[in-house]
Design a protein with these regions (language model features):
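Cleavable N-terminal export/targeting peptides
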Residues: 1-57, 203-214, 610-616, 620
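Exposed, low-structure sequence patches enriched in small/polar residues
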Residues: 3-4, 21, 121-123, 240-283, ...
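Acidic, small-polar-rich N-terminal luminal/periplasmic segments of exported/outer-membrane proteins
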Residues: 25-122
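Outer-membrane beta-barrel proteins
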Residues: 39-43, 49-50, 55, 131, ...
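Short strand-turn segments of transmembrane beta-barrel domains in outer membranes
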Residues: 99-101, 112-118, 122-144, 165
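Transmembrane beta-barrel wall of Gram-negative outer-membrane proteins
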Residues: 138-160, 169-202, 250
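Long, disordered, Ser/Thr/Pro-rich
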Residues: 156, 292-294
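Flexible loop and strand-edge segments within Gram-negative outer membrane beta-barrel domains
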Residues: 188-249, 277-287, 295-299, 303, ...
């Protein structure tokens, strides 16, 4: 607490000192209403791509005004803000050499290293995001950044969410803290970046509605219009995902491009990061449908991961040859539990450990109008198998049209909780020996102002892993639970997405349509065939152009499909082919406004629910 108080005091002192130096120029005369150009407010991504502060109001900003601060077109949210999302589409990762941690359904709001940005601003910059939540709750994101000098920037952001929810035992609580800093030497030869990220994502779990409550909900019984009166399967469970990460990256330019005639630059760098993750599941009393338990009361599962990485790299930039990067990474991870589990038919270990070395490279070049890029990496030592190759070529046909083709090949071990899991529930304990997941993807993208933005991908997956109800369980076994499984055949998956906006005077119609087809493996790979979103709105300026507004209606629809089910013990989704969801539109009414740099969003969500005679909208089986 003392350190945090000192940090806040230093920030306030820096704000005051910077404000004084900016308000009073060297000649002693105060300059009124002088504002730096917006292009001086720079946002720098992990990949060192630079964007600028954007205070405009667009329909895309409305799509991103949510808990994740991103467009959720391919996601289906649960009933309460801060809960998980069911995926309407599958996006395969392509640059990962190690397995992922447990509880992936709760990682949507977990900032990984690639999600962290750094900043460079001429004056202190603050952004406050506030949005109401369900039943005694609020969402708040607070962001502050300042340059104490031209070379050093510091930023602090915090996301806090607490929402009781409309259904019993669905409270959510999120507290995510991110601190970043970056420094450039005056000659721009040396640069260092640092961040600390802390996550605390709590969800109380209820197991979904009981069968009787599901019938009352579907029939829209007026006595249960207050959703809090519907019974849930249990009222005494919660899970919690926590994580903390320390990251530092620095580089030094041995050779610099001094001017436009220089042809070569050489940079050496290294990165080091350490991360701890913790997933906990608590339940006061064992829930019978999950099967027998080692403890009848006060059930508690704790899964941990310690992940340490050191990377060294060299980057060569040459006007003629292109940009090259080579790197090597040392990784040491330790996943698991505190004790070994001894069973009648064997033993379940408590740890998965490895110390591995990977090497890789990247290349980028502009050649005769083509933008060429490639990345590759492979684990060369250690027990963990993993590699990837990504390549892309883009070409601008004209100022309005650009095309790109890509290929991705990725092999990686299944997530840790597919390999090893321990729980106080007897049925939730396993140690598996699965094959490496092998993914190949061909992609094509078109960006055209006159036609549409189009993306097409064809993905093939061998040894696809998933959670599902074991089909070998007897019909007399009422304790059906998801277990890790690996598909012995190949999954082939086609996805086509198109976006286009039509404008006429002050009216606009924004369209997003996605078509999906699982050509093989549809029994284990559940996605809707069609997803569509249309936004019809009107925009204009009023009050002598002091206020810019947009008002209209959003419609989102996806076809019926066998949605994945949700398991609160694992905090994972599992494949089920018994119950379909979807086939219903969700219509929102909205009014957005911008006054100077303030943006206001007012939305009446799911407006058409007022006119439904029955309720068929679910986020997952058992979860309205």
């Amino acid at each position: 607490m003392k350190q945090f108080f000192l940090l806040v005091c230093l920030c306030l002192w820096a704000c005051i000192a910077t404000a004084q130096s900016q308000d009073t120029p060297l000649n002693g005369k105060k300059i009124e209403n002088e504002k730096p150009p917006i292009a001086l407010y720079k946002f720098i991504s992990h990949q060192r791509d630079t964007t600028y502060l954007d205070t405009t109001l667009t329909i895309q900003k409305s799509y991103k005004f949510n808990y994740l601060r991103s467009d959720t077109f391919e996601l289906l949210p649960f009933s309460n803000v801060g809960q998980t999302y069911n995926g309407l589409a599958i996006n395969t990762t392509s640059k990962r050499l190690t397995p992922l941690f447990a509880a992936q359904s709760h990682h949507y709001n977990y900032k990984e290293i690639e999600d962290v940005s750094y900043f460079n601003v001429p004056t202190p910059l603050t952004e406050i995001y506030f949005k109401t939540a369900f039943e005694q709750g609020q969402q708040l994101n607070a962001f502050f950044t300042i340059n104490t000098s031209k070379q050093f920037n510091f930023s602090l952001s915090y996301q806090g969410v607490r929402s009781l929810g409309n259904y019993q035992q669905s409270l959510t609580s999120t507290g995510n803290l991110l601190i970043t800093s970056n420094y450039f030497s005056k000659n721009n030869r040396y640069n260092v970046r640092f961040h600390v990220a802390s996550h605390d994502i709590l969800n109380r779990e209820n197991g979904g509605l009981t069968q009787n409550s599901l019938a009352l909900f579907i029939n829209d019984d007026p006595e249960f219009s207050d959703r809090g009166r519907l019974d849930v399967n249990f009222e005494d469970a919660e899970n919690n995902l926590k994580g903390v990460r320390f990251y530092m990256s620095q580089e030094y330019s041995l050779l610099q491009k001094a001017d436009s005639t220089s042809t070569t630059a050489l940079t050496l760098g290294n990165s080091i990061w350490y991360e701890e993750k913790l997933f906990e599941y608590r339940q006061n009393t064992a829930y019978e449908p999950y099967g027998a338990s080692y403890e009848p009361v006060d059930l508690y599962n704790k899964t941990t991961l310690e992940d340490f990485n050191i990377q060294a790299y060299a980057r060569l930039e040459n006007t003629l040859l292109g940009n090259f990067k080579v790197f090597t990474t040392l990784t040491d991870y330790n996943y698991g539990y505190n004790s070994v589990l001894n069973l009648d038919n064997g033993q379940i270990p408590n740890r998965i450990k490895d110390n591995m070395v990977s090497v890789g490279g990247a290349y980028q070049k502009q050649y005769k109008g083509f933008d060429l890029a490639a990345q590759a990496a492979i684990n060369v030592s250690g027990a963990t198998t993993g590699n990837y190759i990504n390549a892309a070529a883009g070409y601008s046909l004209n100022e309005d049209t650009r095309v790109q083709g890509s290929i991705k090949i990725h092999n990686v071990a299944p997530n840790f909780n597919f390999q090893l899991y321990q729980s106080d529930y007897v049925n939730y304990n396993w140690k598996t020996e699965f094959n490496t997941i092998k993914t190949q993807e061909l992609g094509f993208d078109l960006w055209s102002k006159k036609v549409a933005n189009l993306s097409l991908s064809y993905t093939g997956i061998d040894d696809y892993t998933y959670f599902a109800i074991n089909p070998s369980q007897s019909q007399e076994d009422t304790f059906l639970r998801p277990t890790p499984q690996q598909f012995t055949s190949r999954v082939n998956y086609l996805k086509i997405k198109a976006e286009r906006e039509f404008n006429w005077r002050g009216f606009a119609l924004n369209n997003t349509i996605m078509y999906q087809n699982v050509l093989s493996g549809s029994t284990v790979f559940n996605v809707p065939e069609l997803i569509t979103r249309q936004s019809l709105y009107y925009q204009d300026q009023i009050f002598k152009n002091a206020l810019f507004f947009q008002t209209g209606v959003n419609l989102k629809y996806f076809t019926k499909y066998n949605s994945n089910g949700y398991d609160p013990v694992l905090a994972e989704f599992y494949v089920q082919n018994e119950q379909e969801i979807g086939g219903f539109p969700v219509i929102d009414l909205f009014f957005n406004a911008k006054i100077r740099q303030t943006r206001i969003f007012v939305t009446w969500e799911h407006f058409n629910a007022l006119f439904s005679k029955t309720n068929q909208y679910f986020s997952a089986p058992g979860y309205p």
